[in-house]
Regions:
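Short glycine-rich or small-residue beta-strand-to-loop segments that form or flank ligand, phosphate
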Residues: 5-14, 72-77, 184-190, 300-307
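N-terminal beta-loop-helix "entrance" segment that forms/cooperates
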Residues: 35-59, 228
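Buried hydrophobic positions in well-ordered alpha/beta secondary-structure cores of metabolic enzymes
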Residues: 12-15, 69, 130, 172, ...
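Glycine-rich phosphate/diphosphate-binding loop of Rossmann-like nucleotide-binding domains
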Residues: 7-24, 29, 149-221
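Glycine-rich phosphate/pyrophosphate-binding loop and the adjoining helix
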Residues: 140-186, 190-194, 312, 317, ...
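N-terminal glycine-rich phosphate/adenylate-binding segment common to multiple enzyme folds
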Residues: 50-155, 243
Length: 361
């Protein structure tokens, strides 16, 4: 029996509630399958670790994760610690340290979800947003001088490399090629950003020649937001820069019903390092400890984790269980207009997994 080693990093806020919920459903899948199992190791990094040690994770933290098969992450963010410290000290340290250059965010309207768009059928909103996850606007290049003085100045430099753009474009075209519609939209802002984004466009055109069966178009990022709202059915796979995709994917999740249901995978496609899977929602300290957090985003992230490990049948089972649960309004959490608790949703998903395991093959 294959045993997968999973690093679990709850992080901050409701991450401490949804990651254990994710472990529960993964364990339930393993129990019903008997062909694989999980060995979980929990890491208490985040805001509490920072208060005790002055850093969000240990200096050699990446070494502790390096031999894992995957990472399940909760959230980073603490109201008492500056956001750039919590993000750069933990999540981005892992993403960049393990060169998880492809951030993949699927979005669709799940059964039972009352999405806010009028005249939008569930089949009209079925997207995957590919986010360049290693450079661009979040490269960390820049600085501040003369702090606190009238002449203070600061820069954040968006840095793009040919190698970085080529690999994310190739990844996005390949992903689009694997989907039924074989359709890719390259999001840009080359009308105003006349250097790096022009290179981005040129490389997209270059890479498109390797995928003649993929139909692709180009859209300015501001126009892309309007298109997502007004013509969602014209989109399928999108690729965008670090900042642009960060914003667009949150909009996508809201259009599908809630940030609480949205997953993401930070992927190293070459599999040199473990990839990391997480819900896209934040730490939500206002509801922490109240049992109100929606664990569906974490469960869907676990689907992506299973797919990455090659456990396709288990991933399909978990996705079916999720859809059966979201189809029942009585099992909707507060963000979806219901009153169900985190544990009630978790138990319901576990029950569906067990029920499917009892069905004759």
């Amino acid at each position: 029996m294959k045993i997968y080693k999973i690093a679990c990093i709850p992080g901050d806020g409701i991450g401490k509630e949804v990651v254990p919920a994710g472990q529960e459903v993964l364990a339930a899948l393993a129990s019903s399958s008997r062909s694989f199992g999980f060995e979980f190791e929990n890491f208490g990094w985040g805001g509490d670790w920072y208060r005790a040690h002055g850093e969000m994770m240990p200096a050699k933290g990446l070494d502790a994760l390096r031999q894992k098969d995957a990472i399940l992450f909760g959230s980073a963010g603490d109201p008492d610690i500056a956001d750039h410290i919590t993000l750069w000290g933990l999540r981005l340290k892992i993403c960049q340290g393990f060169d998880q250059y492809a951030n993949v965010r699927p979005t669709r309207i799940l059964p039972g979800i009352d999405a806010p768009l009028k005249r939008c059928r569930p089949q009209d909103l079925d997207w995957v947003i590919v986010r360049e996850n290693s450079e661009g606007e979040y490269a960390g290049v820049g600085g501040r001088v003369h702090q606190g003085q009238p002449i203070e100045a600061a820069t954040d430099v968006s840095m793009m490399t040919r190698a970085g753009v080529e690999r994310i474009m190739r990844f996005a075209f390949r992903l689009a090629q694997s989907r039924p519609r074989k359709l890719l939209t390259v999001v840009t802002k080359s009308n105003a950003q006349r250097h790096a984004m022009v290179m981005w466009d040129e490389i997209a055109l270059q890479i498109s020649g390797e995928f003649p069966d993929v139909k692709w178009d180009k859209e300015l990022v501001d126009a892309a937001t309007a298109r997502m709202v007004n013509r969602p059915a014209t989109l399928d796979t999108l690729v965008a820069t670090n900042l642009h995709a960060d914003i667009l994917s949150d909009l996508a999740a809201a259009l599908a019903g809630s940030l609480g249901i949205a997953p993401t995978g930070n992927i190293d496609p070459e599999r040199r390092y473990p990839s990391m899977f997480e819900p896209i929602h934040g730490s939500a300290f206002d509801i922490m400890g109240k049992g109100l957090a929606n664990p569906v985003g974490t469960f869907w992230s676990c689907v992506m984790l299973l797919e990455h490990l090659g456990e396709v049948e288990a991933a399909r089972t978990l996705m079916q269980a999720i859809e059966q649960v979201t189809a029942e309004p009585a099992l909707h959490t507060r963000d979806l207009g219901g009153n169900a608790t985190t544990q009630q949703v978790t138990q319901a998903v576990r029950d569906r997994i067990a029920a499917m395991a009892r069905q004759p093959v």
